């Protein structure tokens, strides 16, 4: 606002360099919202999404893979392709690709929707994998890798919809079945969503097992957290005063201020084959963070980093996914200042007994190869049963593990 009130002389006096010969000098009409030329200067909207670490531009009639270095685009598929793969003999199902999602890094799977229906397509195999319909108030959270089970929210409660699970004890026929996992969901009891204020790398609240039969999920009780006063301000261009007030309305948020009472989080596991849910027996959740949930390759064990609220004591623990029993503490890291786990462990595709762990214990985020000892994850507190070897080192940071080269047995 101060800059808007300044003239050209004021700008030069404050250190703005005049345009050199051949360069355009911007005016307030170019830069100020509402200026005569402002609309021509604003960058055009581009709909983009991520496919793992790859950037995809979504357009009305096609999706393009964007080279992050050069900006060059490569067409992945078009709207006509999608409709042909979905239903070659029927009317058009999808009319735009703005909402296309790529849920699995490294897999050629795209999810597109049209109204209440969502289609999952393999765009390399040119094949429809699944088709499902969501009613009003139902929001898809995550599908399993097999595309035969979907976690979704209905209101504030968590559900799972399964398809073609012939061995399911509750669904013998090849049809869909809905399981209601929770019935006490509310503004204060939150299911299947990101917890702990999105800290420690947490960005979601559901985690499918590799075999697609088990769903781990967060349950957050924030009834004890004080409301933080905020307001909902109508969008610019609001033009329906006859049906809704244009005045800001209260929209309090549950925010645990420093030193105040925090929420309590637990981790549940739903079994699609039995329809039963168990909760991990992690003890009293008061002033504790449960972060970076990961599955073992055989879908029998859940791993997570547990952290105290002071954030100076972090433990990698293991739980039996069927019973919820704690089976071991694999690793412990403490620090006088803080510990910040931000990445779940990642098992090697060629060795189900070894995984990659990321830690900043030497001052920089680096990779460590961890191998379970002869006792596996069944030891009580014997951290010596985990062999740890530092893979990277130096005064630089590992930003992300992009994947594995199984032929060369290397990490990317």
Regions found by a protein language model. Name each.
Residues 1-2, 412:
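Accessible peptide chain termini
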Residues 12-412:
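Beta-propeller folds
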Residues 2-10:
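C-terminal segment of classical bacterial N-terminal signal peptides
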């Amino acid at each position: 606002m101060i800059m808007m009130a300044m003239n050209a002389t004021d700008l030069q006096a404050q250190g703005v360099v005049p345009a050199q010969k051949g360069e355009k000098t911007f005016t307030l009409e170019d830069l100020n919202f509402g200026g005569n030329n402002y609309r021509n200067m604003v960058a055009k909207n581009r709909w983009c999404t991520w496919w793992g670490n790859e950037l995809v531009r979504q357009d009305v009639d096609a999706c393009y893979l964007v080279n992050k270095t050069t900006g060059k685009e490569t067409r992945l598929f078009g709207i006509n392709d999608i409709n042909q793969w979905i239903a070659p003999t029927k009317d058009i199902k999808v009319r735009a690709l703005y909402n296309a999602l790529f849920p699995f890094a490294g897999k050629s799977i795209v999810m597109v929707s049209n109204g209440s229906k969502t289609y999952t397509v393999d765009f390399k195999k040119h094949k429809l994998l699944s088709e499902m319909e969501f009613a009003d108030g139902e929001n898809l959270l995550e599908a399993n890798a097999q595309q035969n089970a979907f976690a979704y929210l209905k209101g504030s409660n968590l559900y799972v919809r399964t398809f073609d699970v012939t061995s399911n004890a509750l669904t013998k026929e090849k049809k869909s079945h809905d399981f209601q996992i929770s019935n006490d969901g509310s503004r204060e009891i939150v299911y299947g969503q990101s917890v702990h204020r999105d800290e420690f790398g947490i960005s979601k609240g559901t985690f499918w097992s590799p075999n697609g039969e088990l769903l781990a999920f967060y349950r957050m009780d924030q009834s004890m957290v004080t409301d933080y006063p905020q307001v909902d301000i109508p969008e610019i261009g609001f033009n329906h005063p006859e049906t809704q007030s244009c005045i800001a309305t209260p929209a309090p948020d549950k925010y645990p201020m420093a030193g105040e009472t925090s929420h309590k989080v637990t981790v549940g596991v739903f079994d699609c084959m039995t329809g039963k849910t168990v909760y991990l027996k992690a003890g009293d959740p008061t002033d504790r963070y449960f972060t970076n949930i990961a599955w073992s390759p055989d879908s029998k064990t859940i791993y997570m980093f547990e952290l105290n609220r002071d954030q100076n004591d972090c433990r990698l623990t293991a739980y039996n996914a069927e019973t919820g029993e704690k089976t071991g503490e694999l690793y412990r890291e403490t620090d006088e200042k803080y510990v910040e786990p931000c990445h779940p462990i990642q098992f090697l595709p060629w060795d189900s007994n070894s995984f990659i762990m990321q830690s900043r214990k030497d001052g920089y985020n680096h990779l460590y190869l961890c191998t379970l000892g002869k006792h596996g994850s069944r030891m009580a507190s014997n951290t010596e049963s985990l062999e740890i070897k530092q893979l990277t080192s130096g005064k630089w940071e590992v930003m992300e593990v992009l994947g594995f080269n199984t032929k060369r047995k290397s990490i990317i």
